[in-house]
Amino acid sequence: MIASTGKTNLLGLTQQEMEKFFDSIGEKRFRAGQVMKWIHHFGVDDFDAMTNVSKALREKLKACAEVRGPEVVSEDISSDGTRKWVVRVESGSCVETVYIPQGKRGTLCVSSQAGCALDCSFCSTGKQGFNSNLTAAEVIGQVWIANKSFGSVPATVDRAITNVVMMGMGEPLLNFDNVIAAMHLMMDDLGYGISKRRVTLSTSGVVPMIDELSKHIDVSLALSLHAPNDALRNQLVPLNKKYPLKVLLESCRRYMSSLGEKRVLTIEYTMLKDINDKVEHAVEMIELLKDTPCKINLIPFNPFPHSGYERPSNNAIRRFQDLLHQAGYNVTVRTTRGEDIDAACGQLVGQVMDRTRRSERYIAVRELSADVDTAPAAATRT
């Protein structure tokens, strides 16, 4: 456990919360914007470095507040430019944050929980069980740490982080309030100023919270589907027993239509040899998604010891992709980046992180990043 100081951590406060904090200590609300810029634009955690803040206020802040992100355990850089941070949160658990560069884009994959309670059969993270929800400061702190590492100012055109995906450890919708607060900071001009189209939340399908999402925020949505029928998805994603596909896809369509503009759902589909990669599965998927504006990411499974699953052949993957293409869907197949640092750090977070989920995230993150600007409307089934 990391000892708590009892002070208010300003790192995770939204603009509204920051203004209320300054009210509570008898200061003007405009101070909130000043301090937020120092924290998020310049990565400052020392109040004495906030030079446009009076000395008296700095002393007051030192007495009752702090700026504290997760503790960086390690930072590794792959030969392809991918970066991975292992960070320790207040519960004592470690989580991962991954940065994937691609041309002028830089996508950061952020964790929302330590461990996971969903127990998906092809993902050993769930087998470790759930440890804790991350605080808003620990979620946005991953962006803060990465930004500081690059020495990048968020508001500038050459900033390192252009996209963020909530696709790290955990189910974001099961840590709803903290994830919402962190995503607001990602998009706030006093925070990181990232476009709503470039912030993506990935979910396994917590239907009530998908319905709640549109009341609180407007971000892109990705669904971890992995099966084209309920019987198979019940095996792969046990959450499906509670929220079957018909109900789940209806909730996704409601959310997408609530955005009031032409946006599409991203479907993530991990391909498992002889499990969900056959022609009949592609045919079922075509029928399942016919009323859902979407694009599809096919993610070849990356085996890990004792998983019980294998990666399909390249021919099987291409055949599956071709069938979906012929039906009018925009479909991509992606390969992993950062494999060399994946292996190097696997043991460090072995109790809370597995190789398969990392592979799935790296691939999907890369595609989501590329998707923002390049996918023509005509190429997407609507």
From Swiss-Prot:
Disulfide bonds: C109-C345
Cofactor: [4Fe-4S] cluster
Main localization (coarse): cytoplasm
Subcellular location(s) per record: Cytoplasm
Keywords for the protein's UniProt record, in alphabetical order: 4Fe-4S, Cytoplasm, Disulfide bond, Iron, Iron-sulfur, Metal-binding, Methyltransferase, rRNA processing, S-adenosyl-L-methionine, Transferase, tRNA processing
GO molecular function: 4 iron, 4 sulfur cluster binding; metal ion binding; rRNA (adenine(2503)-C2-)-methyltransferase activity; rRNA binding; tRNA (adenine(37)-C2)-methyltransferase activity; tRNA binding
GO cellular component: cytoplasm
Residues reported in the UniProt entry to bind [4Fe-4S] cluster: C116, C120, C123
Domain named Radical SAM core: residues: 102-342
PANTHER family named among the record's database cross-references: 23S RRNA METHYLTRANSFERASE, RADICAL SAM CORE DOMAIN-CONTAINING PROTEIN
Identification of the protein by name: Dual-specificity RNA methyltransferase RlmN
